[in-house]
From Swiss-Prot:
This is BTB/POZ domain-containing adapter for CUL3-mediated RhoA degradation protein 1. Residues 1-21, 280-302 are annotated as: Disordered. The keyword Nucleus applies. Belongs to the BACURD family. Homotetramer; forms a two-fold symmetric tetramer in solution. Interacts with CUL3; interaction is direct and forms a 5:5 heterodecamer. Component of the BCR(KCTD13) E3 ubiquitin ligase complex, at least composed of CUL3, KCTD13/BACURD1 and RBX1. Interacts with RHOA; with a preference for RhoA-GDP. Interacts with POLD2 and PCNA. Interacts with SPRTN. Keywords: Nucleus, Ubl conjugation pathway. It comes from the Eukaryota. InterPro entries: BACURD1-3 (IPR045068), BTB/POZ_dom (IPR000210), SKP1/BTB/POZ_sf (IPR011333), T1-type_BTB (IPR003131). The lineage of its organism: Eukaryota, Metazoa, Chordata, Craniata, Vertebrata. It comes from Bos taurus (Bovine). One of its GO terms (biological process) is negative regulation of Rho protein signal transduction.
Length: 329
């Protein structure tokens, strides 16, 4: 900070200009440090090259590190120009001073600058500003929705890597029309599209809680798989081989209710501890088996996969005359 005399008396008035600390050289007459005078009401601060002129009342009004420095409990040194040197970045020091004066201050919009201001507030122990910055950062995190990214599986190895790299439950849809050997029934194309559309809707709704994968290289035509804590929990296969005419046909179904059920069931695997056994049994994850011991039930549960599969190929001789039959495993 500096001031200069102007007008007719400029030649007679002594200059009030103070040399900046950066202009002071060792060995010069102005070089050297001396204690801050105790009767001064004003303080000149050089914070990392940023110059500030404020009052002792502002610096000591709140219980901060600056109050500890300037309350007289410790000796504060100034250079020959009267500047108190503080070895910190001065970028946000003006905001710190404004908060000490007014008790509030507009916060930066940038998350990066907000984090920098939080760091300076912590250094100077300005508790109110620390809390304001932390709250603003938390609100920014809550307002930013996670991206809806759906990886496409290109190999079994990649699938295992994806399953191992996430802590979220996983929903995978395999759809690969090239696996079909027969003609489709009249509703199969429509049902295949419905499965894909439902997958997209679920991904938009639950992408913050579940990882969704697409598989276009598997050996099924349409199949849903549900994973929790790295292992497969349930599987819903939507294809079957039927006799609608005198030849085999591929039928694609759309078990919407079952898909919704398994998607909601897999959410119980969100916690690192895994699902509660009572909740797992209530959702159909436990076996009946009245004669089995509790330990056997728990061991079986670890390796059991709930499946709805339509796999069996029905020959012409096995089919009752004039009827369409679908066998489910």
């Amino acid at each position: 900070m500096s001031a200069e005399a102007s007008g007719p008396a400029a030649a007679e008035a002594p200059s009030l200009e103070v040399a900046k600390p950066s202009e002071l050289e060792p060995g010069s007459a102005a070089y050297g440090l001396k204690p801050l005078t105790t009767n001064s009401k004003y303080v000149k601060l050089n914070v990392g090259g940023s110059l500030h002129y404020t009052t002792l009342r502002t610096l000591t009004g709140q219980d901060t590190r600056l109050k500890a420095m300037f309350s007289g409990r410790a000796e504060v040194l100034t250079d020959a120009g009267g500047w108190v040197l503080i070895d910190r970045s001065g970028r946000h020091f003006g905001t710190i001073l404004n908060y000490l004066r007014d008790g509030s201050v507009p916060l930066p919009e940038s998350t990066r600058e907000l984090g920098e201001l939080l760091g300076e507030a912590r250094h100077y122990l300005v508790q109110g500003l620390i809390e304001d910055c932390q709250l603003a950062l938390q609100q920014k995190r809550e307002n930013v929705s996670p991206l809806c990214l759906i990886p496409t599986v290109t190999s079994p190895r990649e699938e295992q890597q994806l399953l191992a790299s996430t802590s979220k439950p996983v929903v995978k849809l395999l759809h690969n029309r090239s696996n079909n050997k027969y003609s489709y029934t009249s509703t199969s194309d429509d049902n295949l599209l419905k499965n894909i559309e439902l997958f997209d809707k679920l991904a938009l709704r639950f992408h913050g809680r579940l990882l969704f994968l697409k598989d276009v290289l598997g050996d099924e035509i349409c199949c849903w798989s549900f994973y929790g804590q790295g292992r497969k929990i349930a599987e819903v296969c939507c294809t079957s081989i039927v006799y609608a005419t005198e030849k085999k046909q591929t039928k694609v179904e759309f078990p919407e209710a079952r898909i919704f059920e398994e998607t909601l069931n897999i959410l119980i695997y969100e916690t690192p501890r895994g699902p509660d056994p009572a909740l797992l049994e209530a959702t159909g994850g436990a076996a009946g088996g009245g004669g089995a011991s509790r330990g056997e039930d728990e061991d079986n549960r670890e390796h059991r996969v709930r499946r709805i599969h339509v796999r069996r190929h029905i020959t012409h001789d096995e089919r009752p005359h004039g009827q369409q039959i679908v066998f489910k495993d």
